[in-house]
Swiss-Prot record:
Organism per entry: Mus musculus (Mouse)
Task performed by this protein: Meiosis-specific component of cohesin complex. Required for the maintenance of meiotic cohesion, but not, or only to a minor extent, for its establishment. Contributes to axial element (AE) formation and the organization of chromatin loops along the AE. Plays a key role in synapsis, recombination and chromosome movements. The cohesin complex is required for the cohesion of sister chromatids after DNA replication. The cohesin complex apparently forms a large proteinaceous ring within which sister chromatids can be trapped.
The encoding gene: Smc1b
SMC hinge domain span: 514-629
Pfam families: SMC_hinge, SMC_N
Residues annotated to bind ATP: 32-39
Protein name, entry field: Structural maintenance of chromosomes protein 1B
Chief place of localization: nucleus
Length: 1248
């Protein structure tokens, strides 16, 4: 047998580009991590072997192209090729290509159709439909759990007997139709034969009409013989029917007993499953109780974590705000530093300019000492002359300077105030947004809270009602249990009572409107104190059966005889001799009439009570009863409450313990009602317990309500604080800043106006001073060549003053900037300290949150574990409930079967009673006929016996049963000679014909002279009718023969198809059933292991299931479901290998068949596969267990690589270079795998 050499895949599923997988050895294992694409090798082999797309884990064929599952296929086509090499060395190539949403098939290099492709695969032993070389993942487990019918379908696929199913069903239907047609034509032929017989009789009557005169002498004999003949024939028929009916009744009773046994077994199973369900429910309740404790802890931990997270978010927000303010502060500091730098540069530039100007002016004007003295003298004159004006001018200048400084200060205040106002407005907007969010959150919380409170109220009300109802139910149950315990009645009936109850039920079903029941069940005393007295007086009638009529009572007695049941007393309403009631007895004091202390719901039964009780009286004490019974002028029947009875005859009968036990039967009905009430209350209590479990939901809702209330309270407090405190403060500050801005604006305006007015005054004083100076310095100015003295002073003296002034302003401005810079830096330092403090708080908060989250996760883990356990128990509970429901359904089905069979028994018993009545009536008719012969001296010939043996008394249906039985037994010994009876009279078929002839003979006997005149004229056309009927009979016979021939041909055709299907199936089944035991022994490495297949239908095994059972080594026989997972897997593998041996493929591919095997079974299975791969066929196995694939001849490793999507790579390793020396030594206890520790990388010298 050849072998698979290589597998070539191109852009198939996880294989990108063209990949070469192989070469494959006799025993090759494919290994790799999960998700690497190992199963895609299996899919590639399935694909190239013609498998349908639906079995390849995709919806359409284009999804098999690499990258298609991500929406980015790398190509529009993909292909898979296998290279198969025959033993002769011939190489065969099979290729399947995906192109344009369709498959193309190539054998060798030529495209072929699918049918040719499949045929070429079958030539090398691969059957596509049977999948005889592929075992997919999970198939082994599914094979071990197959139902017998599914296993049969599996065998039909392997044996190809399923190909005959259509033809088999068609031939079978055709055969059934042909047989129905043949039966129909047979019935037609039978009816025509009856017509022909009837026509013959009419012809015989016509012929006998001529001889009627001769037969008048023997008319009485003929009449008697005729009656006796058909009476005896009817008796024989009835006896035969009675025997047959008794046989049928026995069979049906056996069936009833069988179904009743099944019903009892099912009820026993139902009780066991119910106890298991109760235990599981108890366990579920325990888990739910623990869950109810842990869930609030988790909710509390979650709320605590949420609260700390909110505080952390608030701290982070404060850090963000502080960081923004720090950023603004830093920008301000940088601006101040830049301003200081600019100020220093400006000062240095100014000093440089001043030095240059001084040098220039020194060159322009140079005064002599005399001129300088004269200048000082003139200057002193001017000072004295304008001293007052100078003082006023200086005063104005100082005031103006002060006002300018105030104006500059107010402008700086204006800028700072505007900045603060802008910041206040931003904070107001932020708080408004925060208010909106809080109001929205508050509204959501209130809506949620209202909803939860409604749910809480509803649940509280429901639970309170449930608890109240549970209390009431428990009280009622307690009372009922006490009553049942106080009753102390042994209610378990014996077999005798059960049999009597069953007989009564049968009678009620036979006569539903006529059998009322036992007297005990139809009435009861008006008070418990009368129970003993009523029981004593009723006596044997207490369990008597009340029926409607005497006839029904006799039918019931016959039924009891037929059933060999115990004798029963019957009270027929139309047969009772009822004595009138003595109304005067009601007037006697100290007693009551017995009929007055008994009540019934059925008015027609009062006659029965009157018959049983008569004029009996009931008294309180024994003395009163004795006095009333014997103390008066006439004796009366009286009974005391303790059961002591005084009869008219003087007999006194006392009460007894047996009487008390009998009297307890009156309580049976009440106890039955109490048990029904108890069952209803127990069921209601179970439902209430289910409702009470909602307390868990109530606690959860209460916890949620509490958490929501807390969050709502925090939100409302924060909202109120923002509205009433923060926002009001900001608005107040905004108002203050706005009013302050207005004040500053008005101050600036006023200061500007004052400065302008002062400037005007300064200019006026300066003009006056200038005029004085001009007058005094006029000559001096002309001498030095200047226009006026101010020009000289501006160039020399004034310049120095201006320089001093400038220096003073520079120093003031620099001082101000330094102060402002230091203040800003202090503020920045404070904010940074705040940020550090907040960061420390956040860090600590994060640590707290981590701890809280850890606590929360622990709580959540516990809750989730409990919930998982709860769900698992619920699943078990659901499974048990489902099993109970199934058992309950089966019990109901068996109950229906029992009732159906019981109805059938009742029906058959009724028919038996009817037949017995008819038989007794016929025996009575025979006796009266023989008696008539004896009395009227009708000489009938007797073969055995004599008419003298007939007792000369006429029997009726009311005679004693024993007497009639003796008479009938004597008459049965008399044998009558019916040879004188005409043959035509013996040949009558229907009862109607018998009655007609009987009437005819009676008329003939009654009127001998007028017989010819009164007899109906015969059918004169009987001969023609007979000819017509004979032609019709011949035609129906021909049609019947044709239909019977057609049915025979259909039977032959059906048997041929049946034989072909049976042969195909049996050939496969016999081969597998023989080889599976040897394979299982080899797999288990033990000859004591057994595996066997057995068909449920040996004649046609493909119509029913096939059972598969294995006996593991060292274990007793048990069903397949009770085997362990590893044993099931080995059994399934044995079946797979046995099936494969029937239609062996050149190679066998299995996907993770070792998944359910333990180490021991892995060693056995791998050793067996090793042997088979060397001797029989090539094995390719996908495996994840090193203990398994270490036995292989070669390994193919599959590993994934991820780029845009995952794609697979392949490595190969030849293990034949590493012999398994441990196997040769036979060491099995501590075996290590022989896989060498080599690097499985593309650069490895062993890799391909």
């Amino acid at each position: 047998m050849g072998h698979l050499e290589l597998l070539l895949v191109e852009n198939f599923k996880s294989w990108r580009g063209r990949q070469v997988i192989g070469p494959f050895k006799r025993f090759t294992c494919i290994i790799g991590p999960n998700g690497s694409g190992k199963s895609n090798v299996m899919d590639a082999l399935s694909f190239v072997m013609g498998e349908k797309t639906t079995n390849l884990r995709v919806k359409n064929i284009q999804e098999l192209i690499h990258g298609a599952h991500t929406g980015k296929p790398v190509s529009s086509s993909a292909s898979v090729t296998i290279i198969y090499i025959e033993d002769s060395g011939e190489e065969k190539t099979f290729t399947r290509i995906i192109r344009g949403g369709c498959s193309e098939y190539h054998f060798g290099d030529k495209p072929v159709s699918r049918s040719v492709y499949v045929a070429q695969l079958e030539n090398i032993g691969i059957i596509v439909k049977a999948q005889n070389c592929l075992v997919f993942q999970g198939t082994v487990e599914s094979i071990s759990m197959k139902k017998p019918k599914e296993r049969t379908q599996f065998f039909e696929e392997i044996s190809t007997s399923g190909e005959f199913i259509g033809e088999y069903e068609a031939k079978k239907k055709k055969l059934q139709k042909a047989e129905e047609d043949a039966q129909f034509h047979f019935n037609v032929k039978k009816n025509v034969a009856a017509e022909r017989k009837h026509a013959k009789i009419e012809k015989e009557e016509a012929e006998h009409y001529q001889n009627l005169l001769e037969e008048l002498k023997i008319n009485k004999i003929q009449l008697m013989l005729f009656q006796l003949y058909y009476n005896e024939e009817k008796i024989n028929v009835l006896n035969t029917e009675l025997e047959q009916m008794d046989g049928n009744l026995s069979v049906v009773k056996d069936t009833l007993s069988h179904h009743e046994n099944i019903f009892k077994a099912k009820k026993k199973d139902y009780g066991m499953l119910t106890r298991q369900l109760q235990q599981t429910a108890k366990e579920l309740k325990s888990v739910e109780a623990i869950l109810n404790q842990k869930r609030p802890q988790y909710i509390k931990a979650k709320e605590n974590t949420s609260h700390h997270l909110k505080k952390l978010d608030l701290s982070k927000k404060l850090i963000t705000d502080n960081e923004k303010q720090c950023s603004k502060q830093e920008d301000g500091i940088r601006a101040l530093v830049a301003e200081l730098a600019d100020l220093d540069r400006a000062w240095k530039s100014f000093e440089k300019q001043m030095e240059e100007k001084i040098l220039q002016k020194g060159r322009d004007i140079e005064l002599e000492n005399s001129q300088l003295d004269r200048y000082k003298l003139l200057k002193e004159q001017v000072r004295r002359k304008v001293g007052i004006m100078t003082q006023q001018l200086e005063k104005l200048q100082w005031e103006q300077k002060a006002e300018k400084e105030r104006l500059a200060f107010e402008k700086r205040r204006h800028g700072d105030t505007q900045g603060n106002l802008k910041q206040i407005k931003e904070q107001i907007e932020e708080h408004k947004k925060r208010i909106e969010k809080l109001e929205e959150y508050t509204k959501t919380c209130m809506d949620c809270l209202e909803d939860k409170k409604q749910q809480e109220e509803a649940l509280k009300k429901e639970i309170e009602n449930t608890k109240s109802r549970m209390s009431e139910v428990n009280e009622e149950l307690s009372l009922i249990r006490n009553e049942l315990q106080n009753a102390g009645i042994d209610n378990h009936e014996g077999k005798r009572q059960q049999k009597r109850a069953e007989v009564l039920e049968h009678l009620k079903r036979l006569y539903p409107d006529s059998v009322f029941g036992r007297l005990l069940d139809l009435c009861h005393p008006i008070h418990k104190k009368y129970q003993l007295a009523v029981t004593k007086l009723f006596g044997r009638y207490m369990v008597a059966i009340v029926v409607a009529s005497e006839k029904i009572a006799k039918d019931c007695i016959r039924f009891l005889k037929a059933e060999r049941a115990e004798p029963e007393t019957f009270l027929a309403l139309d047969y009772l001799d009822i004595k009138p009631i003595n109304e005067r007895l009601r007037e006697i004091k100290g007693c009551k009439m017995m009929i007055d202390v008994i009540k019934t719901q059925f008015p027609q039964l009062k006659k029965v009570i009157q018959f049983v009780c008569g004029n009996g009286l009931v008294c309180e004490t024994v003395e009163e009863a004795r006095h009333i019974a014997f103390g008066g002028p006439e004796r009366r029947k009286a009974v005391a409450l303790d059961g002591t009875l005084f009869l008219k005859s003087g007999v006194i009968s006392g009460g007894s313990s047996d009487l008390k036990h009998k009297a307890l039967c009156w309580d049976e009905k009440e106890l039955h009602n109490l048990r029904d009430k108890r069952s209803q209350l127990v069921q209601e209590l179970k439902e209430l317990m289910k409702t009470l479990r909602k307390e868990t939901d109530l606690k959860q809702i209460q916890t949620l309500v509490q958490g929501t209330n807390t969050r709502l309270k925090y939100s409302q407090n924060e909202l109120e604080m923002i509205k009433k405190k923060h926002l009001a403060t900001f608005y107040r500050e905004q108002s203050q800043l706005q009013s302050e801005l207005l004040n500053i604006d008005s101050q600036c305006t006023m200061l500007s106006e004052g400065i302008n007015k002062q400037q005007q005054k300064i200019e006026e004083f300066q003009d006056k001073i200038d005029e004085v100076e001009d007058d005094i310095f006029q000559d001096f100015c002309e001498e030095i060549g200047v226009e006026n003295i101010r020009e000289f002073e501006n160039k020399h003296v004034k310049q120095q003053q201006e320089n001093d002034q400038k220096r003073l302003e520079f120093e003031k401005q620099k001082t101000r900037l330094n102060i402002q810079l230091e203040y800003s830096r202090n503020q920045l330092k404070k904010k940074l300290n705040n940020i550090d403090t907040l960061k420390t708080t956040i860090q600590k908060g994060k640590e707290d949150i981590d701890n809280l989250k850890k606590t929360e996760e622990e709580c959540l883990k516990i809750v989730e574990e409990l919930m998982v356990k709860q769900e698992q128990i619920k699943e078990v509970l659901a499974t048990q409930s489902s099993n109970i429901e199934k058992i309950h359904i089966q019990i109901e089905e068996e109950r229906k079967k029992v009732l159906a069979v019981d109805r059938e028994v009742g029906k058959l018993q009724k028919e038996v009673v009817i037949i017995q009545g008819s038989l007794e009536q016929k025996l009575l008719e025979k006796h009266n006929l023989l008696l008539d012969c004896k009395v009227q001296d009708i000489d009938i010939s007797l073969v055995l016996g004599s008419l003298e043996d007939i007792i000369e008394m006429e029997l009726t249906e009311t005679e004693s049963t024993q007497a009639t039985a003796d008479i009938y037994e004597k008459e049965a010994s008399i044998q009558i000679d019916y040879s004188p009876l005409r043959e035509d009279l013996k040949a009558l078929q229907s009862d109607k014909e018998v009655e007609a002839h009987l009437t005819l003979l009676l008329q003939q006997v009654a009127s001998q002279e007028n017989t010819l005149l009164k007899t109906t004229a015969p059918n004169l056309r009987a001969q023609e009718n007979l000819k017509t009927v004979r032609d019709k009979f011949q035609e129906s016979a021909d049609v019947f023969e044709a239909s019977r021939k057609e049915a025979r041909i259909c039977r032959q055709e059906f048997e041929q198809v049946k034989r072909r299907r049976y042969d195909a199936f049996s050939q496969c089944f016999e081969h597998i059933s023989v080889s599976i035991d040897q394979i299982y022994k080899k797999l288990c490495r033990n000859n004591s292991a057994q595996a066997f297949l057995s068909p449920e239908n040996p004649e046609e095994p493909y119509l029913d299931g096939i059972s598969y059972n294995c006996v593991a080594p060292g274990k007793r026989f048990m069903p397949m479901d009770n085997l362990s997972g590893g044993e099931k897997c080995v059994a399934a593998l044995a079946l797979l290998f046995a099936v494969h041996s029937f239609r062996p493929a050149p190679f066998f591919v299995l996907d993770e068949v070792d998944a359910a095997l333990d180490n021991t079974n892995i060693g056995k299975v791998s050793s067996y596969i090793k042997e088979q791969s060397q001797e029989q066929f090539q094995m390719i196995i996908i495996s994840l267990k090193e203990e398994f694939y270490s036995k292989a001849d070669a390994l193919i490793g599959v590993y994934p690589e991820h780029n845009e999507c995952m794609f697979s790579h392949v490595l190969t390793l030849d293990l034949s270079k590493y012999p398994d020396t441990e196997d040769q030594e036979g060491s099995r206890s501590h075996r290590k795998p022989r896989v060498p520790r080599v690097s499985m990388s593309p650069k490895s010298p062993q890799s391909r």
